[in-house]
Amino acid sequence: MAKAATPKTTAAAEAKPAAAKAPAKKAPAKTAAAKSDAAPKAAKTGAVGKITQVIGAVVDVQFEDGQLPLILNALETDNLGSRLVLEVAQHLGENTVRTIAMDSTEGLVRGHEVRDTGNPIMVPVGEETLGRIMNVIGEPVDEAGPIKTTARRAIHQEAPEYIEQSTEAEILVTGIKVVDLLAPYAKGGKIGLFGGAGVGKTVLIMELINNVAKAHGGYSVFAGVGERTREGNDLYHEMIESGVNKLGGGEGSKAALVYGQMNEPPGARARVALSGLTVAENFRDKGQDVLFFVDNIFRFTQAGSELSALLGRIPSAVGYQPTLATDMGAMQERITTTTKGSITSVQAIYVPADDLTDPAPATSFAHLDATTTLNRSIAEKGIYPAVDPLESTSRMLDPMIVGEEHYAVARQVQSILQRYKSLQDIIAILGMDELSEDDKLTVARARKIERFLSQPFFVAEVFTGSPGKLVDLADTIKGFKGLCAGEYDHLPEPAFYMVGSIEEAIEKAKKLAAEAA
């Protein structure tokens, strides 16, 4: 297998795209070794083969002696007037390669000509991608014209060397109370959003994009992996409405979008996360702090499982691919902070049948710095974001990183909620009257804390009618510290529901009292 280029090779080639052109005959070997950011024209120098078999998304191509393309090379063919890209997955013998199609194979016939590009799939990178939507092979799909850049980068790259990686610990303040207090995100870390269907993963991701663009002014890259096309379209238009992006891209846009949605073949869904990550890596290597969102990382695993079956590999546990850990590790190791810049990754992880022991979410756990677990029972109470304060974790919740006060308040909040959870069986059987006075007080405070963990979102304004709130970390700590100490025991429970700071809760309590009078 050819070794992927380091970012250094890429940067050099970006400066001189023309230099990457190789002699006609030796193009496949040379360009695949370099994997440089050549302009796409350089790709037209490779060997030509013929299609021998088409089975769904799997296409076999036969080449002449000595012209076999390398594993992971991109091959191109014309399918009913449109460009179809195939990625080499296996060498079968008799000069035949087995490839995975990045788009529909309807219309392909045996004997059809296929050209080796000599490179892996190359996608456009740089600021010209901001505000645009592209697909897995870097083609714009937003009907706003071509992406005006010659800089391209291979989607298969090596992870940064150990000496290039940074080890500083710093919090990324999101403005979402439950996240900042109980499971804070590391700048340059990997965060998993766990939850079943319909508990609010995508809404939380959209709120994070919105808050980070407003509060930090950083670039974001959003990879839509195997999710609903409607949601992708909604996200694009909401970004334009909220000012995160400008229509058609250009100056002022803060996010690049890379989509491979539910209706795409498994090849596109398995590679689109890498295409998005490649765009993010380019920003990082130029000194940016980038946010990389993946919705949904489970679909990446699911697509890999489909491909594995199509390629005839023996399935592993629960029918997943035998290379599940390898595939996940190859991608996750590239998401890291270097001495140049950082990639903070937020990955929505669908949990099949709400089972956290399923191999797909379980494999993802190993790579994460923080987990935000969304719980259906919390969503059923109408508390949004439906983040489980006891299940969500973060390695950043350490007094050496967040400070003694933040750590003490977070642990106190969790202990009150844990005590309430353990009392719920007694309450269900015997009722509140059988509890001691101390336990009654704990339950009352826990119910107020639960409601105070809710928060109106900017991106949900259209549904709720409540204006969104971005809460400062100091205000969050102050509010929960007072709640735990009993300073707000006199306020009614509804006053804490769907507010930002504690001052807003006090104001709401006054309004409720006035309405009752």
From Swiss-Prot:
Naming one, the record's GO cellular component terms include: proton-transporting ATP synthase complex
Give the membrane topology: Peripheral membrane protein
Start-end of Low complexity biased regions: 1-22, 29-42
SUPFAM superfamilies of this UniProt entry? Answer: C-terminal domain of alpha and beta subunits of F1 ATP synthase (SSF47917), N-terminal domain of alpha and beta subunits of F1 ATP synthase (SSF50615), P-loop containing nucleoside triphosphate hydrolases (SSF52540)
- Which family does the entry's similarity section mention? Belongs to the ATPase alpha/beta chains family.
Q: Where does ATP bind?
A: G195, G196, A197, G198, V199, G200, K201, T202
Q: Which GO terms describe its molecular function?
A: ATP binding; ATP hydrolysis activity; proton-transporting ATP synthase activity, rotational mechanism
What are the EC numbers? 7.1.2.2
Keywords recorded for this protein, A-Z:
ATP synthesis, ATP-binding, Cell inner membrane, Cell membrane, CF(1), Hydrogen ion transport, Ion transport, Membrane, Nucleotide-binding, Translocase, Transport
- Domain of life from the UniProt record: Bacteria
Keyword Nucleotide-binding attached:
yes
At the highest ranks, the source species' classification is: Bacteria, Pseudomonadati, Pseudomonadota, Alphaproteobacteria, Hyphomicrobiales
Any idea what this protein is called?
Answer: ATP synthase subunit beta
Question: Which coarse location class describes where this protein primarily resides?
Answer: membrane
Q: Which reaction does it catalyse?
A: ATP + H2O + 4 H(+)(in) = ADP + phosphate + 5 H(+)(out)
Q: What does this protein do?
A: Produces ATP from ADP in the presence of a proton gradient across the membrane. The catalytic sites are hosted primarily by the beta subunits.
Q: Which gene encodes it?
A: atpD
Ribonucleoprotein as UniProt keyword? no
Top enzyme category: translocase
User: What is its subcellular localisation?
Assistant: Cell inner membrane
Give the matching Gene3D superfamilies. Answer: 2.40.10.170, Bovine Mitochondrial F1-atpase, Atp Synthase Beta Chain, Chain D, domain 3, P-loop containing nucleotide triphosphate hydrolases
Q: Which HAMAP family match?
A: ATP_synth_beta_bact
Note the subunit structure: F-type ATPases have 2 components, CF(1) - the catalytic core - and CF(0) - the membrane proton channel. CF(1) has five subunits: alpha(3), beta(3), gamma(1), delta(1), epsilon(1). CF(0) has three main subunits: a(1), b(2) and c(9-12). The alpha and beta chains form an alternating ring which encloses part of the gamma chain. CF(1) is attached to CF(0) by a central stalk formed by the gamma and epsilon chains, while a peripheral stalk is formed by the delta and b chains.
* Region feature (Disordered): 1-42
